[in-house]
């Protein structure tokens, strides 16, 4: 492993005003990581003065320039220090390859899921952690704006109801817990993973770390090439965010890539293998049924889900029902033993706007709702995956149908992409649809990169995809009435009007790019960020804000 490729902390990565801070819990000995931005002046908002802004931070130790980190050793197992006695866990099997820790599993017949404890009325350390994290140390501000801060009890209630999930496998002690649900901050997921045509373990670990640093709340390893197990191990041991996978991909590799040779036994063993490593959620395509295949195969673009196409091939070859459906209860029994959440895959999502909202898509959605209830009976956490390609005016129906059929389980969508002609710019295309559906209640957006439909993304593509979808999620949070999201914009506006460039850089979603663009343009004028009372878009003589200030100062 090349340590230099691991995105190790660099001084002032987020800017000189940014630092990593922690907030202590009151129920458990937890320390919740956040980022604090010091401002160059004090700004007034609703009668309150702010000389700093605490920010939600997904970067973990990688965002702390004061700490050294060696990816060859992995992150510290912070959850192991919280002292929560699950009481029903035992160690099994051999040692994990990087850490020497033995995998843990619930004793026979027991459950260790967040939903299980929530339904018993127990607030776990993870629940307290996400409550503190969602508030961003701004409880007083939230109340001043007429809102209610998130409490551990509220988190417990939402998880017990199934309206939110905390993906946190008991074998992934390195993560900083987060929550996915419509009553919380909108989250984003970044997909990484090798293919048969390229990428290495080093590159995928770096992309995972890079995703966390720029704002991805979860990461999915969708590797389909060589060294799937080893790649996943390196990613898990170095990930402060939950990791998801599609176990079907590795199961397919085990049978030489031949879908017809897949079996429940191969798939079951793959689930256990990945659960023991620490994967936090699985995408499982249990909703594609033999009866729905004719509708899907008659579409303009057929079945565009990789997992969906694999299981369709298996069903056709064996003339049997999808074993991910028929063995669903067995799947849940495995997952409840490790607290792996299920992301019910949309195997029949539309791959073109002409196929949006058709019988195949919504037929599968109804099946996913039925499976949700079956998973909940076993205290397994569930979220529902959604489309896909959907024109803007048809997006609202997707959210309404999901709420109707899936019992308010969190919705997790790929976009939606609102047009089919944006190749090279599909990250923007996805963010347009994502902003709308998130404002309507979607809990998490899966990012799309500029390489979508074209090729395997590199590190720079990952950054671009994460930031663009972070913009979409933030815009949706504002539309939903988030007081913390609104405050960040309020402070940015005041900094902009005051020509406080350093504060603008610090408050931006991409401080590095913001600073670079301004520095490149202002250098030609002879001014600096410290002195310029204008930007090069308008220049010193045509700056509207500068003129407005001069007019006000003159009493005109």
Swiss-Prot record:
Binds 1 [4Fe-4S] cluster per subunit. The cluster is coordinated with 3 cysteines and an exchangeable S-adenosyl-L-methionine. Keywords: 4Fe-4S, Iron, Iron-sulfur, Lyase, Metal-binding, S-adenosyl-L-methionine, Thiamine biosynthesis, Zinc. Substrate binds at residues 191, 220, 249, 285, 305-307, 346-349, 385, 412. GO terms for biological process: thiamine biosynthetic process; thiamine diphosphate biosynthetic process. Zn(2+) binds at residues 389, 453. It catalyses: 5-amino-1-(5-phospho-beta-D-ribosyl)imidazole + S-adenosyl-L-methionine = 4-amino-2-methyl-5-(phosphooxymethyl)pyrimidine + CO + 5'-deoxyadenosine + formate + L-methionine + 3 H(+). One of its GO terms (molecular function) is zinc ion binding. Pathway: Cofactor biosynthesis; thiamine diphosphate biosynthesis. Signal peptide: none annotated. [4Fe-4S] cluster binds at residues 535, 538, 543. Catalyzes the synthesis of the hydroxymethylpyrimidine phosphate (HMP-P) moiety of thiamine from aminoimidazole ribotide (AIR) in a radical S-adenosyl-L-methionine (SAM)-dependent reaction. GO terms for cellular component: cytosol. Belongs to the ThiC family. NCBIfam families: PRK09284.1, PRK13352.1, thiC. Its cofactor is [4Fe-4S] cluster. Its EC number is 4.1.99.17. This is Phosphomethylpyrimidine synthase. The keyword Flavoprotein does not apply. The keyword tRNA processing does not apply.
């Amino acid at each position: 492993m090349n340590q230099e490729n691991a995105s190790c902390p660099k001084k002032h990565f987020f800017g000189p005003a940014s630092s990593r801070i922690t907030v202590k819990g009151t129920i458990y000995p937890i320390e919740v990581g956040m980022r604090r931005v010091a401002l160059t002046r004090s700004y007034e908002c609703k009668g309150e003065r702010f000389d700093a802004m605490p920010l939600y931070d997904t970067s973990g130790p990688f965002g702390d320039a004061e700490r050294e980190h060696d990816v060859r050793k992995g992150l510290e197992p912070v959850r192991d220090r919280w002292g929560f006695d699950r009481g029903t866990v035992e160690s099994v099997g051999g040692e994990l390859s990087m850490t020497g820790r033995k995998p843990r599993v619930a004793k026979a017949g027991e459950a260790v899921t967040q939903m299980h404890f929530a339904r018993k009325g127990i607030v776990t350390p993870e629940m307290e952690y996400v409550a503190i994290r969602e508030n961003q140390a701004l409880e007083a501000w939230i109340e001043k704006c007429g809102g209610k801060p998130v409490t551990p009890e509220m988190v417990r209630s939402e998880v017990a109801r199934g309206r939110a999930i905390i993906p946190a496998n008991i074998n992934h002690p390195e993560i900083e817990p987060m929550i996915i649900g419509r009553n919380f901050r909108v989250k984003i997921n970044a997909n990484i993973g090798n293919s048969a045509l390229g990428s290495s373990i080093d590159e995928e670990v770096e992309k995972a770390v890079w995703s966390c640093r720029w704002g991805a709340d979860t990461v999915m390893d969708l590797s389909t090439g060589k060294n799937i197990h080893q790649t996943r191990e390196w990613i898990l041991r170095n990930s402060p965010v939950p990791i998801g996978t599609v176990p079907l991909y590795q199961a397919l590799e085990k049978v030489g890539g031949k879908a017809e040779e897949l079996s429940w036994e191969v798939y079951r063993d793959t689930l256990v293998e990945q659960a023991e490593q620490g994967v936090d959620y699985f995408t499982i395509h249990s909703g594609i049924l033999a009866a729905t295949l004719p509708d899907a195969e008659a579409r303009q673009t057929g079945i565009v889900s990789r997992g969906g196409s694999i299981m369709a091939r298996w069903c056709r070859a064996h003339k049997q029902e999808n074993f991910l459906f028929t063995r669903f209860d067995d799947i849940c029994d495995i997952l409840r033993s490790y607290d792996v959440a299920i992301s019910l895959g949309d195997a029949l999502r539309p791959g073109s706007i002409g196929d949006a909202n058709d019988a195949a898509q919504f037929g599968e959605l109804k099946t996913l709702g039925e499976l949700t209830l079956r998973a909940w009976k076993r205290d397994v956490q569930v979220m529902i995956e959604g489309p896909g390609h959907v024109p803007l005016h048809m997006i609202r129906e997707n959210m309404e149908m999901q709420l109707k059929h899936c019992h308010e389980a969190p919705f997790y969508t790929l976009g939606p992409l609102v047009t089919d002609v944006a190749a090279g710019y599909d990250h923007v295309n996805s963010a347009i649809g994502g902003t709308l559906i998130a404002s309507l209640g979607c809990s998490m957006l899966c990012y799309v990169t500029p390489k979508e439909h074209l090729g395997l993304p590199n590190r720079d593509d990952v950054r671009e995809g994460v930031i663009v979808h972070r913009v979409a999620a933030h815009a949706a949070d504002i539309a939903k009435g988030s007081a913390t999201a609104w405050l960040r914009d309020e402070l940015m506006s005041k900094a902009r009007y005051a020509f406080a460039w350093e504060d603008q850089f610090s408050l931006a979603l991409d401080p590095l790019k913001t600073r670079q663009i301004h520095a490149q343009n202002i250098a030609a004028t002879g001014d600096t960020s410290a002195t310029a009372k204008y930007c090069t878009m308008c220049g010193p003589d045509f700056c509207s804000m500068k003129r407005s200030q001069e007019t006000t100062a003159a009493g005109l």
